[in-house]
Amino acid sequence: MSQTFGNSSKYLFTSESVTEGHPDKICDQISDAVLDAIIAKDPTAHVACETAVTNGLVVVMGEITTSCYVEIPELVRGVIKDIGYIKPEYGFDDRTCGVLTSINRQSPDIALGVNKSQEAKSGQVDELDLTGAGDQGMMFGYACTETPEYMPLPISLAHRLSKRLAEVRKNGTLPYLRPDGKSQVTVEYHNGKAKRISSVVIGAQHDPDITTEKIQADIIREVIKPIIPTNLLDEKTEYYVNATGRFVVGGPVSDTGFTGRKILVDTYGGFARHGGGAFSGKDPTKVDRSACYMARYIAKNLVAAGLADRLEIQVAYVIGVAHPLSVSIETFNTARMNHEDILSIIQKHFDLRPEAIIRNLGLRRPIYRQTAAYGHLGRPELDLPWERLDKVDAIKATIESLSVSK
């Protein structure tokens, strides 16, 4: 996919985001709130928490092995309240919704490989080999020089618009807004560089007595214009605000939500490939989550060190085995070093075994709920360990030594 865009001198690329009040994002936040509550008390707990929301009902289910107890219904209602579903007229609120739970222990067959990896069973004594990957699969990380946070511009702007939509609702700037909402940004690229914004789409849930004309004018003035750089807007930029003309019924009343249904919103907005695994509700032994974070960490530090303008890394695992099956990279013809040398730098500076990832990034902490809306990656307002650029100097030193040796 990326090669198709890269071979065209002019193309459009679109990414979307959703607000914290979107039904799928309600579920992600609940699942990660449960994870945080458990991991705060029991850092080595195994958690796979799924949530579904629908009209008047929340169902929390999954497989959890832990020594602690958390009051899940109380957590659920707290998340719903924090999001802003607090009025009965919304049709779904924190006080009246039903909460059902169905929690089992993690399968002992899975635990056999996670708690004692294949390497450990063979007699290897390195403690970082003890934890096996929690599942098979492939995970991707990506970084580019397009934005200060090393994220693609379309998803970066879409997230900022969604956050702004929630902000003007919560601070009273646009008090008639309700929690559900979406954003979408289409960027026009010329020779791989962002040239202009082709279109901006906003869906904003609202009270019934507000006119479409007022909503459109308010959203453009208070949401779009403060976020989109003026140098990327022109007279041809198209704005679509509540394109159906009405968005009163929203949230779980209008759409059933599930954990893990917004995986491209959570990552790169489709600009990079995705292995298919979701993040929220999963403890860090699940490489769906932790290896994606690590892959982002690697890609971001490599790009920041000047090795490429765009870099995508794939890592693959087998359940119960600590060492990855494969590591590969794609630099989209932007690399300043051959791929073999870049892979050697990755091997030198980054340990991709699950236990090493968990320890090096400090993942056995309650840091996950804050990532469950507005993206897990490229969040400059959060101190996320996989977003740190603390390997850049060491990478540059290795680049220098490789240059000298040649």
From Swiss-Prot:
Binding site for Mg(2+): D24
Top enzyme category: transferase
InterPro entries: ADOMET_SYNTHASE_CS, S-AdoMet_synt_C, S-AdoMet_synt_central, S-AdoMet_synt_N, S-AdoMet_synthetase, S-AdoMet_synthetase_sfam
UniProt keyword Disulfide bond present: no
Keywords tagged on the record: ATP-binding, Cytoplasm, Magnesium, Metal-binding, Nucleotide-binding, One-carbon metabolism, Potassium, Transferase
Cofactor(s) required for function per UniProt: Mg(2+); K(+)
CDD domains reported for this sequence: S-AdoMet_synt
GO BP: one-carbon metabolic process; S-adenosylmethionine biosynthetic process
Complex and partners: Homotetramer; dimer of dimers.
Entry protein name: S-adenosylmethionine synthase
Organism: Dehalococcoides mccartyi (strain CBDB1)
Protein encoded by which gene: metK
